[in-house]
Amino acid sequence: IFAGSAGAEEIKLGAAVSTTGKYSTNGAHTTNGYNLAVRRINEMGGVKVGDKTYELSIVYYDDESTPARGAQLAERLISQDGIKLMLGPYSSGLTKAIAPVTEKYGVPMVEANGASRSLFTQGYKYLFAVLSTSEQYLSASIALAAEMAETQGKEPSSVKIAMAFENDSFSQDVRAGVVADAEALGMKIVVDDQLPPELNDMSATLTKVKALKPDVLVVSGHAKGAATAVRQIAEMKVNVPMIAMTHCDSAQIIEKFGKDANY
């Protein structure tokens, strides 16, 4: 939508983002980021297109953390609200649901929160990302584990890894990246678990970790999975030389768990 305003003309962007449901915390971070960007761009004079200058605004709807709802709202934004430029939702699953809609209408979508590699193997022409894909998220952690082994006079192949991942496209892509990196270095994966759908208990995995004593524990389950992991690692007194985890910031583990966040 290109509309007139009191100052400059306006470009309206559309976004279906989670304000309720399991991604509500991450959705809040997403909208905060989008709003900050729009505010700063407008403060600096807006966006110049040709010989005209436009201010930006965003039309939001709550996708309720549900892919089907996200797809419905993308249809609404484009076909009813007349949106010509979209911003992505939070999560790979929601992005995967919305991308076919924006593709169908030829509406560009810039997304910063759908990192699953599978999003970028579909041949989409109107999907643009500004982040690393998920299989790269923990590559540096596995490389660090190899370096730590070498500083202790050990081979990287001596490193044992325990893993627990949510069963969603993002987390499974993170898992695939960890597995590939570990295999390339000859590391042994001693635990390869799937987190429960509710993401509220990983004690079964942590019991195995205590028994097998791996060198590295890797966890990816979005904000709720990170919070559960930090809480139960402390409760069960699980001692692992190195822990690599996604979504610690969005889970607010320092604020919520204090010293247990550094257990």
Task: Describe each model-derived feature in a short phrase.
Residues 2-8:
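Sec/Tat signal peptide C-region and signal peptidase I cleavage site
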Residues 8-14, 108-112, 220:
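Short coil-to-beta-strand
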Residues 25-30, 47-121, 130-133, 195-202, ...:
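Beta-alpha junction/loop-to-helix N-cap segments that form part of ligand/metal-binding clefts
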Residues 32-58, 150-154, 183-187:
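Signal peptide-proximal N-terminal region
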Residues 42, 78, 99-103, 146, ...:
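Surface-exposed amphipathic alpha-helices with a cationic face
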Residues 83-191, 241-263:
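Extracytoplasmic ligand/sensor domains, especially the bilobed periplasmic-binding protein
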